[in-house]
Amino acid sequence: MPTFQQLVRSARKPHAKKTKSPALQGCPQRRGVCTRVYTTTPKKPNSALRKVARVRLSSKFEITAYIPGIGHNLQEHSVVLVRGGRVKDLPGVRYHIVRGSLDSIGVKNRNQSRSKYGVKRPKS
């Protein structure tokens, strides 16, 4: 416990909040170019082939981003929009690719949660 005089000399410093998505540098999204598109396996109890992409952002960061949804059209040199948001069972994946924006098309035959996967309202 500091004395009153010690607090007068130098006030208490507030804790600096550490961002969970530093590559975005405070922006909601960033544009980037895919340098590698591949699949990877999740941590233990889960088993799958998760689709991820290595992306070079406009902020000069090289990150790993998750490709959500079933099926995608991304390949090397595809221009994508990246948002924050980690994937709990993939270590080191702290970003998501935004579907239906730039070179990434929306998910085919998606009828529920369409806005999350870049799908327009179906004609009925």
From Swiss-Prot:
It comes from Prototheca wickerhamii. Keywords: Plastid, Ribonucleoprotein, Ribosomal protein, RNA-binding, rRNA-binding. Residues 10-20 have a biased composition (Basic residues). InterPro entries: NA-bd_OB-fold (IPR012340), Ribosomal_uS12 (IPR006032), Ribosomal_uS12_bac (IPR005679). Belongs to the universal ribosomal protein uS12 family. Residues 1-28 are annotated as: Disordered. This is Small ribosomal subunit protein uS12c. The gene is rps12. GO terms for cellular component: plastid; small ribosomal subunit. Part of the 30S ribosomal subunit.
